Amino acid sequence: MSQTPSSLCDLEHHSAFVERHIGPNDAEIAQMLEVVGHASLDALTDAIVPGNIKSPAPLALPEAITEEEALVKIRAIADKNTVYRNFIGQGYYGTHTPKVILRNILENPAWYTAYTPYQAEISQGRMEALINFQTLCADLTGMQIANASLLDEATAAAEAMTLAKRSAKSRSDIFFVHDAVHPQTLELLRTRAEPLDIMLRVGTPEEALQAECFGVLLQYPDSFGHIGDHAALADAVHAQGGLVAVATDLLALTLIAAPGQWGADIVVGNSQRFGVPFGFGGPHAAFMACRDAYKRSMPGRLIGVSIDAAGNPAYRLTLQTREQHIRREKATSNICTAQVLLAVMASMYAVYHGPDGLTRIARRTHRLAAILAAALRGAGVTVGEHFFDTLHVKAIDADAIHARARAAGINLRAIDSEAVGISLDETTTRADVVALAQLFGAMADVDALDAATADALPQGLLRSSAFLTHPVFNTHHSEHELLRYMRSLADKDLAMDRTMIPLGSCTMKLNATAEMIPVTWPEFGAIHPLAPAEQSAGYAQLIDELEAMLVECTGYDAVSLQPNSGAQGEYAGLLAIRAYHRSRGEAHRDICLIPESAHGTNPASAQMCGMTVVVTKCDANGNVDVDDIRAKAEKYSDRLAALMITYPSTHGVFEEDVVAICEAVHAHGGQVYTDGANMNALVGVAKPGKWGSDVSHLNLHKTFCIPHGGGGPGVGPCAVKSHLAPFLPRAGLHAGEGQTAAIHGGGFNSGSGSGHSSRIGGMVSAAAYGSASILPISWMYVTMMGSAGLRKATQVALLNANYIAKRLAPHYKTLYTGRNGLVAHECILDVRPLEKTSGIGAEDIAKRLIDFGFHAPTLSFPVAGTLMVEPTESESQHELDRFIDAMIQIREEIRAIEDGRLDREDNPLKHAPHTATQVSASEWTHAYPRELAAFPLPSLKQQKYWPPVARVDNVYGDKNVMCACIPVDAYKIPVDAYKEDAEA
């Protein structure tokens, strides 16, 4: 050990987290640099990144601090938020998160570090949880099918509008909106409708009877608590060839008639009150349920039931051809990331409580609301007659009531000068009812009122149908049972707590525990998104500081944190471009150039903005074809709105001509949109806002360490240059703005952050700051890494990708390389030649990797028949070598097929993955040994992941669509009988 004295500064080791986040240590980095042929990280960076885009100076951010120091700083920020008792409602309600779910789902990396379940065989656990969610939503709404989550209720309502437009027989362009929908829903509908030339008409349900429209949106119960009977309206809309969409409350539906019973075609809502905190607006799992006839037009992911190679039931993503990554500009939606982790929490909440427990919670909530209403009426206060949990209190001095409430630490909903709203929930107590009554000068003897007060639900709309009858909702009601059920599901899956997930273009990096800790603090979780601004001063500081960090990292001038996914960030950026052109009298600019290699969300988002997509070519080296871009920019010069590019490219290279590309587009009046999906190769090295790009979205769930959660949540900030800043999404309604302001399009606040007051763009998320409660994760990451740490992380991401490419070069060709034969942060392995010589394709390799305990790389994107590998900076040399060894062994197995030592059909790749049941069966029918199937490398005998199912049959799953909980008997009957049952 060295005896050299160390300074106190050295011993304080402020950069300790940097060494925890970055996988390889300095000695390993030196070894890996030797393999790739460069002397230092700076030399490697210079060899990869074009000189004309490199940043001349370090990031102007503070240097790194320790985890403990960062937690102290963010605790001080959190303490500036003030937690009041919230009765605001408006789509957000208090709830108790069962501690067993908090600890074993939300705080469990087996759940929050998983990726979207594209690889079905290693995703069976979370897909079972999601199919429980789908069953929950379909059962309560009375619909036939539900999806696996959407971003928020307002977004879901907008998706319902476009689904109705696609599917209705009516050719009308009018969509009728109930004037008692939640205000944030109406605002987002306005954003979505205008670029698509959809006319919104807002009014009462009675007025809807006179409208010739392709669809209506009703709120049930409505935003003020009223429960209306809309059956006649539904019949009238159907008679005109329109569809009926309903925004609803899942808890209320345990007591009132399901929308499907009285004529709804599409039902949307938010599952937030099923165990997920306010979180200043998110993240929460919304949902869409609909009639079976519309399933192929639904947005978002659908979990379906198929069978595996052994004939056993198995889950998979079904009907993927609807989605943006396949249909691109023809997709039903740009939805990509949704809210899987929150959907899992909501589903487990339903599993834990079961139908009886949910009904009890609903009845208790309603009972307290009825008692409060009776107390208020006894004091001469006017309240609504029929309601579930929300009272519309009228004919009062609202300002005086709010003043008393604030003095008592209570928030009520502001409606207008003579009315307030009071929404009760699972957390409401008897003492709360007494305190609320006192605000109005009323006395509440809860027991006496309980004995004397009838329920306030309309008798003609009481629920009569059963729900959640499947055993999964009627079994796991003790904590032990739920704990073991959740553990059994987690054990079926591969997440980053077990292995690297080398998905190209997905950036599956470390989600550090210290980053996650503040998410569960009540100072962040218990703030209602419409609470008065003075109660969210901590959030204001957090948002300002995080926006400033992102501005510095990107070189742009302004950032909006409202988009709650990358796709929504894209949409916000393109809307800003569209609004900018219109502000200059150039509304005719509607052409969006998009390279053929682009992410599928790019063209899907462009068409949602009313743009016409023109695809540009890529050259033989994987670069965007600059000449083709120039030619098409000139051809469409008068109409050119934007070019969308990804940088580094989706082909894993830094293109040399990005500056020239930006100049060419600007010369013809267009704007440049740089997709920030690959920002992990740029932070601290280059800034898109400085090389000519006008706007980017970022993925905080990639580059800035928010976990993927199995398919969400995410945050997709939109960053822009100053000329586009006014057109970023506005922050939403004041806490004190009522329904009238929303209906007439007024009443927008200045938001928490600097410069937000001048923003006039349409809202793209229900809440002003989207998924605000997970923003502390990215703040913590940047704060703990510091300027130098962020740059080093980028450099090691480049090193790790090139190390893999170099070591695998004798075995697999890297399809595209950039300058000096190097890749960016990911590499595409071309396995197409192997299919010609052995019959083994990319999917076979992906499935065989499961036998080695690995999640597959990105399959057949952006080039069919290839594998795209992105290791990120967080994987150690040991883990990289483990993956490389697996890929080399797979190449040896392919060589054995080529040489005739393994059969072309009966080989371990064609039959991968292998389950424990298969390899331990008394009969083994394959021509290769069991040991090769199960333990292709000796190290696997020490630690082995066993997939729960064999290879899943995708074709069968799409032909036999079943998206609800599997009947228990399906696990017992022969496969042929199961097929017949599914087909029936």
Curated annotation (Swiss-Prot):
Key word Oxidoreductase present: yes
Enzyme category, top tier: oxidoreductase
Chain positions found as N6-(pyridoxal phosphate)lysine: 702
GO biological process, one term: glycine decarboxylation via glycine cleavage system
Keyword Iron part of the UniProt annotation: no
InterPro entries (UniProt xref): GcvP, GDC-P_C, GDC-P_N, GDC_P, PyrdxlP-dep_Trfase, PyrdxlP-dep_Trfase_major, PyrdxlP-dep_Trfase_small
Record key words, sorted: Oxidoreductase, Pyridoxal phosphate
Pfam families (alphabetical): GcvP2_C, GDC-P
Family: Belongs to the GcvP family.
Subunit structure: The glycine cleavage system is composed of four proteins: P, T, L and H.
Protein name per UniProt: Glycine dehydrogenase (decarboxylating)
Phylogenetic classification of the source organism: Bacteria, Pseudomonadati, Pseudomonadota, Gammaproteobacteria, Lysobacterales
